[in-house]
Swiss-Prot record:
Composition bias type Polar residues, residue spans: 626-635, 699-711, 885-894
Protein name, as recorded: Daxx-like protein
Biased composition (Acidic residues): 1541-1555
Alphabetical keyword list: Apoptosis, Chaperone, Chromosome, Coiled coil, Cytoplasm, Nucleus
GO biological process: apoptotic process; determination of adult lifespan; positive regulation of DNA-templated transcription; regulation of apoptotic process; regulation of DNA-templated transcription; response to oxidative stress
Phenotype of the disrupted gene, per the record: Reduces longevity and female fertility, but increases resistance to oxidative stress and UV irradiation-induced pupal lethality. Double knockouts for DJ-1beta and Daxx restore normal number of dopaminergic neurons, locomotor activity and sensitivity to oxidative stress and UV-induced damage. RNAi-mediated knockdown results in increased resistance to oxidative stress.
Molecular function per GO: histone binding; transcription coregulator activity
Cellular component GO terms, alphabetical: chromosome; cytosol; nucleus
């Protein structure tokens, strides 16, 4: 996967920084023992751990030599990204072919004062001149799953003015031209095979933490002369005996810093020479071997150490360890343990022990190659024994030789060690290693087992002592003896830690103690035998063991190369160290491994010392001058770094079997585990120990090379020690990752290795496994900070040409040479060390730590699916050349970081340089996907000095973050020389809605198989504020397929969210074997808790991103979901959609789980679906029943809504026919559910098949006795109700015999009554309402009038009476309200209001009754079809009935109007009508009389006929026409229309009228109206108020439409008929009277109109 680079820009002060933070910023070197974060950047000290592993006690290398307190460094689970921190990813160029992510953190001191960091430095990005071109690698090949992080002093990254010497694979030293910028490649083993391994290994991301210039200056000053001399000599490839281990270490440190590639190459050559070890070449990379080889001719050293490591070392060391080593190592182990205890660092102790071994093996130690071989041989024997023990023994063996060597040398101390080392040559080591055979190693290992047990106690004591002594040793380089004491104390403390771990790993500890004891007894013998045994074991055996160890763990891999190197110098040293470690324990072995590869360990220690302080540089020069001095320095370095070195070694050993033991010492649990692993892998452990030793040797060699390369001892060698301490923050117990362990074992050498070339895990095993996360352990290995970093050989530079992670580069934007460390005399104290870290993924399964080439763009890390959403591209830095700036006087600001200028996120405006001080990360929800892209920025890079300060701050922050990164180790990163760098600004966010993002996802899905194949990788994703503009240039997407999170990860759609979220958030995702682990950490909100107080944190895998989100309600049942789908299909309107998403969903989840899962409810849903299908137009009606049922259940919220849905088969649905009764009688068959707090749910499901109901209990949990009894009663009632329901159904179908006193009808009523009682009881037990299902029992709420008091009174009256109210009741209520509330309503107004209220309340009650009736009837009819739909005759009859319905409505309306009239008004109307009729009758009579008179006169027949016709006309005229209309005003102002009803036919007889009257009389006071009547009323007879008093218009009244067609006949009884004109729709205009012609013929008989038509309509 493409590696990401984190640039941490720690502005001096930001608004967010508290005084405490400012103090930490001002005094970063201030001792932070409680928190164990001394070396971390001040801003990052608050970052909580990432639970990468148990916190390791790391010796913090301070600028001052007095800094001895161990710092417990625990990787941060969550990385707190302070303001100004940007995270970027590099393309192919950024990452080495090994696939390591380059993470560079560089801090440069712009100010001479220590408070320079506090100054507000604009986070302007500086284009760092690096030859590297920043480009995202497009290769899809996934780098190794593990990311190795090694700390590298930023100054080392810089090119030193003098020519760097490059070691050719053939152990040739090739001087690099000054003009060429030096890239720091991972340290290659003395044999070139390591370089090959580098290609395999992912490039380690080097986190460089430059120490304050003052400390660096001191270290450089002390170590400078010696390191320069030795560097040049060693670089020259001279196999000069190192005057002292200190010199070797110094030289190695110098070489490591300036010539890290050379040391890497040397180590690689050594590895190649080691033969089978080339894969394990990291073992030969052990610092001690390179150191000796460097002091000795480096050329032979690569060859010899590699060969002896591969051959004689495995054999000889094992033999001596098996035989003489156990004997000698016992005393030496004790002595060594004591000096190791005295010596803070194991490496120091080892050197010291080697010096005593020099005493014991004075001749051998004098020829470093020979004596070390001899000494290491016995340790190898012990190592072999420990190798037999594998995990524990390997560690113990290494520690035992360290103890043996350290004890005797501790007594003799640096002088003897130096002498012995000088005496001991590669030849001696090789010879002894050759002499030592596997048998001897095994014997020694067996002896070591016994010794280990004894040594447990000694080691525990010594570890305690070591802890104290290590700190003491850190102080003075010149005091070898006190340092020896310190290492002893440290060893004691470490031994105690180891013993604790060893106690945990009983076998490993016993084995370790035994080898230590045997080694103590046979210190020299073991040393000799072990080399011999190792030689006997043969390089292949050691290689095999290293391979096995590599397979077993990174520690073994690392130990194997170390063993290979130790076969030459490393084996003797390892043996001597192992002999020393028998007493000191595995810590001493590790320290001895550091010491054993005297040069490597010295290099480590010198690197650590360089990292720690100039004092360590001085120690290294002293070691160069005196092996004893170098050992003292190593011891002091180890003491200073006892936490750093020993913890690192212990961490590495914990990772490796020996590293596990060291970690066990550091972390008793881890150490014990590591020791147990070592016990399991004793042979492998020997190989691992040898690897550790060889790695320290390789590291030492690399360190010496670097020291030689670093004649500028002033360079931040000591500041790198702080880096080491930072690197060692926590050793993780991952022996599985040999790469990580190897890289971690030697902070200096691994850094050099990482810088010089791909670091082999065996070389780094000495580093603590702090950063190594289980399979993705990260260790910050610190390369010696060589300010005078000579131009690293192009080879070295080439492997690490990949620019550091863009984010590191961005914030380090300081050009590599931008900040040259001023001469130590001139440099002000560095407030914060500047470090460059390169994160290189390390393969989890690979035993040899070979950084994989990061294929940035194309490679999709397995974690990418979750984390690769945000990707930032590094800026290409072309402004400065790494080679141009001399690194002697200035800290290297991080070769990787400087390689690329800081990358600015869109979160900060590109034009605002100060924006970097603000947090650039956003706290985005876990569902947020961010895809950064690069766009050229117009803003110039920030000034160099500010960039340097920013880099320092960023370096610290990034280092801490890297520590928190799982599966990442820190390795040095080389910067490719470039005259100028282009800044690229990433555009951060792509929304899922964007087409580009969709294409991106498709591409990622295509590459998903590649990710699955790749091992777990660590991805650092910067969650940036989403930019408003889409990304312009998008390189090949790195984001993995959106696996599970694909659906859950959602981009932040709104800019408001992005603006609101200003806190940085880091998403750390690790993918292991296809398992996605995603963690989103809000770094600001996480409290700063000391690691000791923090509980172990783990990253629980999030198998489904949805699970991480808040719990959601269970899905709908299948029936209910089908119902919702059907509703959407039937009605696709938005209203239905709102209903489905609203009430239907809310009510469902608010109802009890027992109810929604019950058979009754599911049956109800099924029936509703059937009805909706048959009557789709009534979909809302049918849904209402379901909603009412759910709503009724919502009343009681007894049960939680989140429910688990059992399979549908669990609650079989009976056919709908089994539910014949309405809801009032048959309650839904639902399982009883009892969910007590904290208890499981009890569900009782009932099957409806038989009369005997079966009850199914689901997840029955422990419930109280009371609940069980209640539950049992409920189930009993349900059974009874079910049986009664069946009986009711049978009785309804039975014939009724009215003569039978106990007829089926009576039985039916009794059963129904009993069913209702049972249902009410069930409701009581379940706490539900008894009447929730009866519409009639629901209260009404009248709100239609404008008077609230009246509304409430009327509603209360109706609900209380449970009867249809009367109009007068309504009117009385209104009158009462008017009187009480003084509404001031007139009588007519009250009548109108009461009338309206009466009608509306009546309709409400009527609708309720209809619904209830419909529910009851439909229960019987079920889903039957309407017979009228298939029978046309029935349909016609129904229509005719509807017509008659209109007539009935008219009658009702007529009498309703008449009811409104007073009796007086009615009487007056009648009188007036009579008078009118009388007048009319008189007129008619007069006409008739005139005609009669005419009859008396003679006339013709024609005239007679005319007269008869006239008389007939007069007689029928008044009745037929009814034209005489008079207007009369009633007292109440109503207009009465009096018309002669002559149109009534004979059909309207008294019988018909009687029938109508009888029909009307049948209505009771409650005014019940049938359903059909009320419906017709609502349609045909709209109600209107009476005519206003002012209206006086003539209205012609017509009785009915039919009147015109009927003969005009008055009613026989002359009875008034009051008809409603409105209902008849027969109003005519007054002018119609003109058209009617009155009959002129008078009628002798007056006709009285018998109908008065009163119209209330307005004309």
């Amino acid at each position: 996967m493409s590696a990401s680079v984190i640039c941490v820009d720690l502005s001096s002060e930001s608004d967010e920084e508290s005084p405490a933070k400012r103090r930490r910023l001002e005094d970063p070197l201030r001792l932070l023992t409680p928190s164990g974060r001394q070396s971390f950047p001040a801003k990052l000290l608050n970052i909580p751990k990432a639970s990468l592993g148990s916190a390791m006690v790391v010796p913090v290398a301070e600028t001052g030599p007095a800094r001895e307190t161990p710092v417990i460094v625990d990787p941060l689970r969550s990385m707190h990204i302070p303001s100004g921190i940007t995270i970027t990813k590099h393309q192919k160029n950024v990452l080495a072919t090994n696939g390591n992510m380059n993470l560079s953190l560089a801090e440069s001191n712009n100010n001479n004062n220590t408070t320079s960091l506090n100054k507000n430095v604009t986070p302007k990005q500086i284009n760092v001149g690096t030859g590297q071109k920043v480009a995202w690698s497009v290769s899809s090949k996934a780098p190794s799953p593990n990311a190795v992080i090694t700390t590298v002093p930023s100054h080392q990254v810089r090119v030193t003015p003098f020519n760097p010497i490059r070691l050719a694979p053939g152990s040739k030293i090739i001087p690099a031209s000054n003009a060429m910028p030096a890239k720091i490649q991972p340290i290659l083993g003395m044999g070139q095979p390591q370089q090959q391994a580098q290609a395999q290994q992912p490039k380690a991301i080097i986190v460089g933490f430059p120490k304050p210039n003052t400390a660096v200056a001191q270290m450089a000053q002390h170590q400078k002369p010696l390191t320069l001399q030795i560097h040049q000599k060693l670089i020259a490839g001279q196999q000069q005996h190192i005057a002292s281990i200190s010199q070797l270490q110094q030289v190695s440190l110098q070489q490591q810093q300036p010539l890290r590639p050379v040391s890497i190459q040397l180590q690689q050559q050594q590895n190649q020479r080691n033969g089978s070890l080339p894969g394990k070449q990291q073992k030969p990379l052990e610092c001690p071997v390179p150191a000796q080889q460097e002091k000795l001719p480096r050329g032979p050293l690569p060859t010899k150490p590699a060969e002896p490591l591969s051959g004689p070392l495995p054999t000889e060391p094992d033999e001596p360890l098996g035989g003489p080593l156990p004997t000698r190592p016992k005393p030496p182990v004790r002595s060594l343990q004591q000096p190791v205890n005295k010596n803070t660092a194991i490496g120091v102790q080892i050197q010291q022990s080697q010096e005593p071994l020099g005493g014991t093996l004075p001749t051998r130690q004098k020829p470093l190659g020979g004596q070390l071989l001899t000494q290491q041989k016995p340790p190898v024997g012990s190592i072999q024994q420990s190798v037999k023990q594998n995990t524990g023994i390997g560690v113990q063996i290494q520690q035992i030789p360290k103890v043996v060597v350290g004890q005797q040398p501790q007594k003799v101390y640096l002088n003897k060690l130096q002498q012995e080392q000088q005496k001991i040559f590669l030849g001696h080591l090789q010879q002894q290693q050759q002499k030592t055979f596997l048998g001897q190693l095994q014997q020694e290992q067996q002896k070591i087992l016994g010794q280990l047990q004894q040594q447990k106690q000694q080691q525990q004591q010594q570890q305690k002592k070591i802890l104290g002594q290590s700190q003491q040793q850190k102080v003075p380089l010149g005091q070898p003896q006190p340092q020896q004491k310190l290492p002893q104390q440290l060893n004691n403390s470490l031994v105690q830690l180891q013993q604790q771990h060893q106690q945990r790993t009983s076998v490993g500890q016993l084995q370790q103690q035994q080898p230590h004891q045997s080694q103590q007894k046979n210190s020299m013998v073991h040393v000799k035998q072990q080399p011999q045994q190792q030689k006997k074991i043969s390089v292949g055996q050691f290689q095999q063991q290293p391979q096995q160890q590599q397979k077993t763990s990174v520690a073994q891999l690392q130990q194997q190369p170390q063993q290979q190197q130790k076969i030459s110098v490393g084996q003797l040293q390892q043996q001597s160290q192992q002999q020393q470690k028998p007493s000191v324990g595995q810590l001493q072995q590790q320290s001895q491994q550091q010491q054993t590869p005297l040069v490597g360990q010295l290099q480590r220690q010198t690197q650590q010392q360089q990292k720690t302080s100039a004092g360590q540089f001085q120690q290294q020069p002293q070691q160069q001058q005196k092996i004893s001095a170098g050992q003292l320095q190593e011891h002091s370095q180890q003491q200073q770094k006892t936490l750093a070195g020993q913890l690192q070694q212990q961490a590495q050993q914990q990772l490796n079997t020996s590293a596990g033991q060291l970690q066990q010492q550091q972390k008793p649990p881890k150490a014990s585990l590591a020791q147990q692993a070592a016990a399991q892998k004793q042979g492998a452990g020997l190989g691992q120990q040898q690897q550790f030793q060889s790695q320290p040797q390789q590291r030492t060699s690399a360190g010496l090379l670097q020291q030689q390369q670093m004649p500028q001892k002033k360079i931040v060698m000591q500041p790198q020690l702080p880096k080491t301490s930072v690197v060692l923050p926590r050793p993780q117990q991952l022996p599985k990752n040999p790469l990580l362990v190897a890289q971690q074992q030697s902070p200096k050498t691994p850094l050099v290795n990482s810088v010089m070339g791909p670091q082999f895990p065996s070389q780094q095993p000495s580093l603590p496994v702090v950063n190594q996360i289980t399979h993705k352990s990260m260790t910050i290995q610190r390369l010696p900070m060589l300010q005078t970093v000579q131009k690293i050989l192009p080879k070295q530079i080439a492997p690490q040409q990949t620019p550091p992670p863009a984010h590191i580069v961005q914030k380090q934007t300081m050009p590599n040479a931008a900040m040259q460390n001023p001469p130590f005399a001139h440099r002000p104290p560095i407030v914060r060390p500047m470090t460059v870290a390169k994160i290189s993924p390390v393969p989890t399964n690979n035993k040899v730590c070979i950084p994989m080439k990061p294929q940035m763009a194309s490679y999709v890390s397995p974690t990418d699916p979750t984390m690769t959403a945000a990707r930032t591209l590094p800026f290409r830095s072309s402004q400065r050349k790494t080679s141009e700036a001399p690194m002697t006087s200035t800290h290297v600001q991080g070769f990787t970081a400087s390689a690329t200028p800081p990358q600015r996120l869109l979160a900060t405006p590109p034009h605002c340089a100060a924006a970097l001080n603000e947090p650039l990360l956003l706290n985005l929800p876990p569902t947020t996907s961010i895809t950064p892209q690069l766009t050229p920025t117009t803003t110039p890079p920030p000034a160099g000095p500010s960039a340097a300060v920013q880099q320092q701050q960023l370096a610290k922050a990034a280092a801490i973050k890297l520590n928190s990164l799982p599966e990442a180790s820190i390795s040095p990163v080389n910067r490719s020389p470039t005259a100028s760098a282009k800044r690229i600004q990433p555009i951060t966010v792509l929304k899922k809605s964007d087409e580009e993002w969709q294409r991106h996802l498709e591409q990622q899905q295509q590459k998903k198989h590649v990710q699955l194949q790749s091992s777990s990788m660590t991805t650092i994703v910067l969650v940036e504020s989403p930019p408003t503009t889409p990304p312009t240039d998008k390189p090949e997407p790195e984001r993995g397929p959106m696996t599970v999170e694909k659906s859950s990860i959602k981009p932040m759609a709104t800019d408001k969210q992005s603006r609101a979220i200003k806190r940085p958030a880091v998403m750390i995702s690790t993918k292991k074997s296809g398992l996605v682990v995603t963690e989103i950490v809000d770094l600001d909100e996480i409290p700063d808790i000391p690691p000791e107080k923090r509980g172990k944190e783990c990253f629980p895998p999030i198998k489904n991103a949805a699970k991480a989100a808040p719990s959601v309600n269970a899905p709908f049942t299948t029936e209910y979901a089908a119902l919702l789908r059907l509703c959407r299909e039937v009605d696709k309107s938005t209203h239905m959609e709102r209903l489905v998403k609203g009430e239907l969903t809310q009510y469902y989840y608010s109802a009890p789980e027992s109810f929604v899962m019950s058979c009754g409810f599911r049956n109800l849903v099924t029936m509703a679906m059937a009805r909706i299908r048959s009557e789709s137009y009534l979909v809302y009606v049918h849904l209402k029943y379901v909603l009412d049922e759910l709503a009724s259940r919502r009343l009681t919220k007894m049960f939680p809504t989140v429910r688990a849905i059992p399979p549908a088969s669990q609650f079989p649905l009976p056919p709908a026919s089994q539910f014949p009764l309405p809801p009032t009688l048959t309650t839904p068959k639902q399982p009883a559910i009892v969910k007590a707090p904290g208890q499981q749910t009890v569900m009782a499901g009932r099957e409806q098949d038989d009369e005997v109901e079966e009850v199914t209990l689901v997840n029955v949990g422990t419930v109280s006795c009371e609940e069980r009894r209640r539950d049992e009663r409920i189930r009993h009632f349900y059974r009874t109700l079910h049986a009664i329901t069946k009986r009711i159904k049978m009785l309804e179908e039975a014939e009724v015999d009215l003569n039978d006193e106990d007829s089926s009808y009576l039985q039916l009523e009794r059963f129904k009554k009993r069913a209702c009682q049972i249902y009410e009881k069930i409701c009581d037990l379940k706490g539900e309402s008894k009447s929730v299902r009866r519409q009639l029992k629901k209260p009404i709420h009248f709100k239609d009038s404008d008077y609230p008091h009246f509304n409430n009174s009327l509603s209360a009256f109706v609900n209380r009476m449970q009867d249809f109210p009367d109009y007068h009741d309504v009117l009385q209520i209104l009158e009462k309200c008017n009187k009480e509330k003084e509404l001031g309503l007139a009588k007519y107004e009250m009548k109108r209001i009461a009338y309206d209220a009466f009608n509306k309340v009546g309709r409400m009650l009527q609708s309720r009754r209809k619904n209830d009736l419909y529910e009851t009837v439909t229960h019987y009819t079920a889903n039957g079809k309407d017979p009228a739909s298939s029978d046309p005759e029935l349909l016609a009859k129904l229509k005719e009935n509807n017509k008659k319905q209109t007539k009935i409505s008219d009658i009702l309306e007529k009498y309703a109007l008449e009811q409104d009239l007073n009796a007086e008004e009615r009487q007056e109307a009648r009188l007036k009508e009579k008078k009118l009729k009388q007048v009319k009758a008189d007129e008619e009579a007069a006409k008739l009389a005139a005609l009669a008179e005419d009859d008396d006169k003679p006339c013709t027949s024609a005239q007679a006929a005319a007269k008869a016709a006239a008389l007939a006309a007069l007689k029928r005229g008044p009745a037929a026409r009814g034209n005489v209309i008079r207007k009369k005003r009633a007292a109440n102002g109503r207009i009465f229309k009096i018309a002669d009803d002559g149109d009534d036919s004979e059909e309207e007889s008294d019988s018909e009228d009687d029938d109508v009257e009888e029909f009307v009389n049948n209505f009771q006071a409650n005014s019940d109206v049938s359903d059909a009547d009320s419906e017709v009323e609502a349609v045909t007879s709209p109600k209107r108020d009476a005519l206003p008093l002012a209206e006086e218009e003539d209205v012609i009244d017509i009785t009915r439409d039919e009147t015109g067609k009927k003969n005009d006949e008055g009613t026989p009884n002359g009875r008034l008929k009051i008809m409603s004109v409105s209902s008849l729709n027969a109003n005519f205009v007054h002018g119609q009277d003109l058209h009617r012609k009155p009959n002129p013929m008078p009628s002798a008989k007056p006709v009285i109109a018998d109908q008065i038509i009163i119209s209330d309509e307005e004309s």
